Curated annotation (Swiss-Prot):
It is a multi-pass membrane protein. Glycosylated. Intramembrane-cleaving aspartic protease (I-CLiP) that cleaves type II membrane signal peptides in the hydrophobic plane of the membrane. This is Signal peptide peptidase-like 3. The keyword Transmembrane helix applies. Residues 29-194, 274-276, 343-347, 399-429, 488-492 are lumenal. It comes from the Eukaryota. One of its GO terms (molecular function) is aspartic endopeptidase activity, intramembrane cleaving. Glycans are attached at N155, N172. The gene is SPPL3. Keywords: Endosome, Glycoprotein, Hydrolase, Membrane, Protease, Signal, Transmembrane, Transmembrane helix.
Length: 540
């Protein structure tokens, strides 16, 4: 392992910082609601459905609002063409807890939450002739409107739904100004299969595969020569000697534990101090890391066939001597990162974010490595617990899922942490994004990269090695993650809950069956034991 030249050392530190912020969560950036245990009784057996509330103010259509149907009441159509458009009117009294003072025939009734049961509000609105009832919540969440124990037989024949406080305030503002507000309600059905999740899965697996095979893809001749030398070194001395021109950071057992603890501290800081300026700083770090990762990838691809292009160099202030090609590529990458930063709130910004993120992760997996299965077990088992705790257990302590809140960003400013891949759900009427955190790619990616190196050094046929099977296991783990996401109605999943058993568990099982687990567990351990003061220390 070589000593660090200053620019590379600074970049490695940046990579480690961004890795600490590599969230491990698969989620859907989507509308959601607060679940409650609701009683079922005759007339109170409806499934909760998300509702689109189209609205017009003096004939001008505005952005649609989101609602949630009650467990009782009439069903809504699934397409707008089958829905009816009615004017909106506030009830009197506003809570709809007693007989209404005026008729509401041909109107959609608006009521505030509180003072009586939801079923009672619906009965009074229906008795006044309302075509539907919208209950305005006293907070931004949408709560499930169920039935009371006494509602043993309920017959409400109008649609009933809840909208958020901000949606109610927007409607109220228009109506206070004596504007004519009309509403149209329908509940679009989501597609049974989310095709964009498949694209995200391919991106994640593709990133890991490309990173693991990067040397073979960019310089196969040199890679074969390097692995031949490594194989001789391992067989004769039990040690590994990395490319002297390539900076490698091997994670140790202590470093693996420290890494997860530090990541948890970062996560809590983001949870408590999430603000636009904090996210700005992290986004700038992301841009720098992604830009340099993109530079490394573009340079490697160009030099694979055209090495002579890097011969001409130029000396620059502060930067020192660099090739003209590298300078031009840096300018292009800088322009790309700046353009994305400026346009990061646009509907197409996900493309630039994913490109920068993938470039960053491919480069990170070249810089940071696992030396053996022992360190991999410590790191991935700690990450396994870390993921489950911050997604599923943290709500019991912090009243919210810390991981999901941080991944979704600050809704008040529109800023979000960019350390995740995301793709818009093109075929979903509700829109939103499917997302996967960097951690769900980097943690298993470190293990799969180790498997690839091990297979190469041992000259394994692909079917008799570890790389192919761990890659398949990773894909299966991601499939299970999105199955869990689907079964839990889009609520964020700790992806490592599924990925770690399908990758690390599979590696251990294969090692046991092949009688190689001891070698995998202690692989390269002699290098650490024979370490001398003159040699660079592995990263802690």
């Amino acid at each position: 392992m070589s000593s660090f030249d200053p620019p590379n050392h600074r970049y490695s530190a940046l990579v480690l910082i961004l890795l600490l912020l590599g969230f491990s969560v698969a989620a859907a950036d989507d509308v959601s609601w607060t679940e409650d245990s609701s009683l079922e009784s005759p007339g109170c057996t409806n499934k909760f459905q998300m509702v689109k509330v189209l609205n017009w103010v003096d004939g001008v259509e505005g952005d649609f609002l989101t609602g949630l149907t009650a467990q009782f009441g009439a069903a809504l159509p699934s397409v707008p063409d089958q829905a009816l458009r009615f004017p909106a009117a506030f009830v009197d009294p506003l809570d709809s807890c007693s007989h209404l003072s005026s008729r509401l025939d041909g109107h959609i009734a608006l009521s505030i939450r509180g003072n009586c049961a939801f079923t009672e509000k619906a009965k009074h609105a229906e008795a006044a002739g309302a075509s539907a009832l919208l209950v305005i919540n006293d907070k931004e969440d949408l709560d499930e409107m169920g039935c009371m124990e006494k509602d043993t037989s309920l017959n409400v024949s109008i649609p009933v739904l809840m909208i958020s406080k901000s949606s109610g305030d927007a409607l109220n503002k228009s109506m206070v100004d004596n504007k004519n507000v009309e509403l149209l309600l329908y509940a679009p059905k989501r597609p049974a299969v989310d095709l964009t999740a498949g694209l995200l899965l391919l991106m994640a697996v593709g990133t890991v595969v490309v990173a693991s095979l990067w040397s073979e893809l960019t310089d196969p001749d040199q890679a074969n020569e390097s692995y031949s030398i490594l194989a001789k070194d391992v067989s004769s001395a039990g040690t590994r000697k990395d490319d002297p021109e390539k900076e490698i950071l091997d994670i140790s057992v202590t470093g693996a534990v420290f890494f997860i603890v530090t990541a948890s501290i970062f996560l809590l800081l983001l949870f408590y101090f999430m603000s636009s300026w904090f996210v700005w700083v992290l986004t700038i770090f992301f841009c720098i890391g992604g830009m340099q990762g993109m530079h490394n990838i573009i340079m490697a691809v160009i030099l694979r066939k055209c090495r002579h292009l890097a011969r001409k160099s130029v000396k620059l202030p502060l930067l020192g001597t660099m090739s003209v090609l590298s300078l031009l590529v840096n300018i292009v990458c800088l322009a790309f990162a700046v353009f994305w930063f400026i346009k990061r709130h646009t509907s197409y910004s996900w493309v630039g974010q994913d490109i920068l993120g993938i470039c960053l992760m491919i480069t990170a997996l070249q810089v940071v490595r696992l030396p053996n299965i022992k360190v991999a077990t410590v790191l991935l088992c700690c990450a396994f617990v870390y993921d489950i705790f911050w997604v599923f257990i943290s709500p019991l302590i912090f009243h919210e899922s810390v991981m999901i809140v941080v991944a979704q960003g600050d809704s008040s400013t529109g800023e979000s942490i960019p350390m995740l891949l995301r793709i818009p759900r093109f075929f979903d009427p509700w829109g939103g994004y499917d997302m996967i955190g960097f951690g769900d790619i980097l943690f298993p990616g470190l293990l799969i990269s180790f498997a690839s190196r091990y297979d190469k050094i041992k000259k394994r046929v692909i079917s008799n090695g570890y790389f192919l099977w761990l890659t398949i296991g990773y894909g299966i783990g991601l499939l299970l993650t999105y199955l869990g996401l689907y079964l839990m109605d889009g609520h964020g999943q700790p992806a490592l809950l599924y990925i770690v058993p399908c990758t690390l568990g599979l590696a251990v099982i294969l090692g046991l069956v092949r009688g190689e687990l001891k070698e995998l567990w202690n692989y390269g351990i002699e290098e650490s034991e024979s370490h001398t003061p003159e040699d660079p220390m592995p990263v802690a």
